[in-house]
Amino acid sequence: MPFKRKDLLGLRELDVHEIEHILELAVSLKEINARPIKKVPTLRGKTVIHLFYEPSTRTRTSFDIAAKRLSADTYSITTAASSMVKGETLLDTVKNLEAMKPDVFVLRHTVSGTPHRIARHTTASVINAGDGMHEHPSQALLDMMTMLEHKKKLDGLTVAILGDIAHSRVARSNIWGLRKMGAKVILCGPITLIPPEAHTMGVEVSHKLGEIIPEADVIMVLRLQKERQQQMLLPSLREYSIYYGLTAEKLKKARRNVLIMHPGPLNRGVEISPDVADGPHSVILDQVTNGVAVRMALLYLLGQK
Amino acid sequence: MKKGKADPCNYLFRRARVIDPARDLDAVADVLVVDGILTDIKPNIDLPSDRLAHFAVIDASEKWIVPGLIDMHVHLREPGEEYKETIATGTMAAVAGGYTAVACMPNTKPVNDCAAVTEYILERAREQGHCRVLPVGAVSSGLEGRSLAEFGELKGSGAVAVTDDGRPVANSMLMRRALEYAKNFDLPVISHAEDPALSEGGLMNEGPTSTLLGLHGIPKAAEEVMVARDLALAELTGARLHIAHVSTAGAVRMIGEAKSRGVPVTAETAPHYFTLTDDRLMTFDTLYKVNPPIRGPADVEAIKRGLADGTIDAVATDHAPHSSIEKDTEFEYAANGIIGLESALPLILELVREKTLTPSQAVAKVSCNPARILGLPLGTLLLNQRACMTYLDPEFYFVLDCTTFRSKSRNCPFHGQPTRGRALMTFFNGKVAFSRLSK
């Protein structure tokens, strides 16, 4: 089935077939990354601009490698400051860049909804590389690809997402994606870090890690940002790690083949202990590897138009 | 209708439905305006044919004549942000919407916290305004929430109320003192009810939609905590409290309970709070970004009930003009606010069509009730005075088109919406301040 969309803004709007199509394509493109010459001419002559209004090493590098392996020309514009601080509006920046005729914008922004706004104002394709607390679709796709590699199917899986769900775009994209693919999603964390009325997204909510560990086929641990303590969401990182940090001790009650995932970067000793992060159940580095394949698939689908 | 520029303002409206809730009047009658003076309202007005020739005679059947509407909550942006709106354009928008008086909030630059600014606003209104402008002074100097503004001087120079609108009065002691001190001068204190700690960082109503969109939410409790505090302080001080832009069911309930206990409180809401729900933000459209935020369906229903049972006294627009510089930007950076002067009337009349309000109740929300709250002898049809009234067609079908608005700003979320009910002529001070009738 051809992928007809101009943009990839989130997983909420994709249907099952579109998600399957992207994942299948990613699996086939992954092989290129294992070749001695890791490059194909698919996007030769195409221009991809990485526009990152938020610091990111992992995602930006992953998209850049993906684009270059498809032979696209890539340019990176990174700034931690908002467009308003610079004095030029984001829209002006995008209009100027568009005048240089790029084919794809890969956009990361601190404000939810910004890729949607940009997509309405440009004829180039826009890939959301993470917007505020809203969505991070390529991350969820690479998570799903990793689960598929290890579990062979998503339908019927129980995936626990652990930690700061309220502020997590990774969690939101995974919720939409996994629910569409037939998985059961359980959110786990203190009430202060679970978004209001989370159940309306079709998930279960638990505040007791001990209770959900035995049920989960996959435990996806989210990064805990240290500023949450200043925002009065937590008394201390110490207490958080006691109740919600994933340790080898707590994992003793887990299923034998449980997968441990984390979108990175890790706070070792806070949300995940080093022995779990590097342990036998961890597929954290597989996620990173699959990230390149998923992003190649997205660029392939959107960059060819 | 023929009316040259030099002609006196002579009108005879035939068979209008005249609704003046202050006098409990709702009847079909003829309305006579002679030289700008509202001379007579009665079932049949006969004029000798030679006199009649000097009158514009209008068949007003199925149309309404109501007192000039009063909007007790607008932002005119002058002085300071004239690129968004001026007293001239804001009052032009007002008369086009059927309003003849607008109360303008003090968050101008400079802030209206002293006689000089109040007098400046009134002077500009006299020079360039198309309708009455009622300046509202600040509660605190510079809206900084630290010390009281000079209420006596503000009132003396023409202010009709005090508020720090746009910002809550966070300090409970300052709010207590404001209520006490305002009582001295018989000024109502208008509360922008918002607990700033609870709303901090919030961009929209907290609920399923904010969760889905990943936008920080503002809980309803942010409004309700402050309403509860201010009701307690009004009870303590016996001073007149007016709650601005009520948006939640809980606030309606608390205000209703306080009123039944005899607390001297009044309240207003705005059309977007009884017309829109927060799922409209699904496209991240900044036109729906407003403070307090657009809430959920249960709140909309509660607001309507509150209007119907009298808990909410008035409908104001909270007309908040912003240019594209403030609105056409990333959601988080976009300014809060919706313009309302030219879209309010059809939205209010929708409440009549759906039978939430009677015509008389609806008119009262935008005429005698705001006048009573502000303590002004307005909002009623006074005979032998210069005409101040609105001639409207409650069924006039049109598509709201903000590109034709008189306001300088375009931040109207109702743009493109088919709607019914529109002001056809607005008389202010004995003159036709606005007319949609062909010349």
Curated annotation (Swiss-Prot), chain A:
One of its GO terms (biological process) is amino acid metabolic process. Carbamoyl phosphate binds at R58, T59, R108, H136, Q139, G264, P265. Its EC number is 2.1.3.2. Keywords: Pyrimidine biosynthesis, Transferase. It is an enzyme of class 2 (transferase). Disulfide bonds: none annotated. Pathway: Pyrimidine metabolism; UMP biosynthesis via de novo pathway; (S)-dihydroorotate from bicarbonate: step 2/3. GO terms for cellular component: cytosol. Catalyzes the condensation of carbamoyl phosphate and aspartate to form carbamoyl aspartate and inorganic phosphate, the committed step in the de novo pyrimidine nucleotide biosynthesis pathway. Heterododecamer (2C3:3R2) of six catalytic PyrB chains organized as two trimers (C3), and six regulatory PyrI chains organized as three dimers (R2). Belongs to the aspartate/ornithine carbamoyltransferase superfamily. ATCase family. This is Aspartate carbamoyltransferase catalytic subunit.
UniProtKB/Swiss-Prot annotation, chain B:
The keyword tRNA-binding does not apply. It holds the Pfam family Amidohydro_1. It comes from the Bacteria. GO terms for biological process: 'de novo' UMP biosynthetic process; purine nucleobase catabolic process. Substrate binds at H75, L76, R77, N107, N291, H322. Binds 2 Zn(2+) ions per subunit. Its cofactor is Zn(2+). HAMAP family: PyrC_classI_B (MF_00220_B). Belongs to the metallo-dependent hydrolases superfamily. DHOase family. Class I DHOase subfamily. This is Dihydroorotase. The lineage of its organism: Bacteria, Pseudomonadati, Thermodesulfobacteriota, Syntrophobacteria, Syntrophobacterales.
